[in-house]
Regions:
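Active-site glycine/GP-rich loop and adjacent strand/helix microenvironment
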Residues: 1-202
Length: 202
């Protein structure tokens, strides 16, 4: 990035923090890097992680959404207003369903994201369950675009932990960790059952 004068970084959010640490360890001044913006996806990340990326790399961080079964990267992007990810609904029909009942969710209600191909000719998918948990918003964005907006991915329906009857998503824990300066954004959750009681160790 330094030698080529790269201005855009595309990777996972966690790898961008690794790169930020590598830049710091290299001894090269951050000001010598020409990075301006980053497009990050492929894993859930929080607003706190966005703030940390922007602070450590001195860039503007944008969310990008995609999955290989639908089209790879580029199913949706954040706009400059960053009020959600605009989905390219001229190519895909997005829906939110309750992951347990499979019934459609109300606009703005969190549930599992489902896609149907509209323009793919070879092997189109119908109501493909992504396992990603989010919500959709249909009001016009302040940027002027009218494409449906998707909230940041909360987690996956198959990643959700139920501990003592409480639904726990790893991204919720990450959000709290990143508010504490003494912690790095790398963590391990150990969930166990002791004496018939669920326990979680961080």
């Amino acid at each position: 990035m330094h030698d080529f004068g790269s201005t855009v970084l595309c990777c996972t959010p966690s790898y961008s923090l690794y790169l930020a640490d590598a830049i710091k360890d290299s001894g090269l001044p951050r000001e010598e890097f020409k990075l301006k913006i980053g497009a990050f996806g492929a894993e859930p990340w929080t607003e706190n992680m966005r703030n940390e990326i922007e602070e450590k790399l001195g860039i503007k961080a944008y969310d990008i959404y995609g999955l290989s079964e639908i089209a790879g990267p580029g199913v949706g992007y954040e706009c400059e207003c960053q009020h959600g990810t605009h989905l390219n609904e001229d190519h895909y029909f997005p829906e939110i369903i309750n992951p347990n009942t499979l019934e459609p969710a109300a606009p703005g209600e969190t549930g599992e994201l489902v896609f149907t191909h509209l323009t793919k000719e070879g092997m189109p998918l119908l109501r493909y369950r992504t396992k990603d948990l989010t919500a959709l918003h249909y009001d016009k964005c302040t940027c002027g675009r009218t494409l449906v907006r998707m909230d940041r991915i909360l987690g996956r329906s198959d990643d959700m932990l139920i501990i003592r009857g409480v639904n726990v998503f790893p991204t919720q824990i990450e959000s709290v960790i990143l508010e504490m300066e003494e912690f790095e954004p790398h963590y391990l959750l150990i969930v166990d059952r002791k004496n018939n009681t669920d326990t979680m160790e961080l």
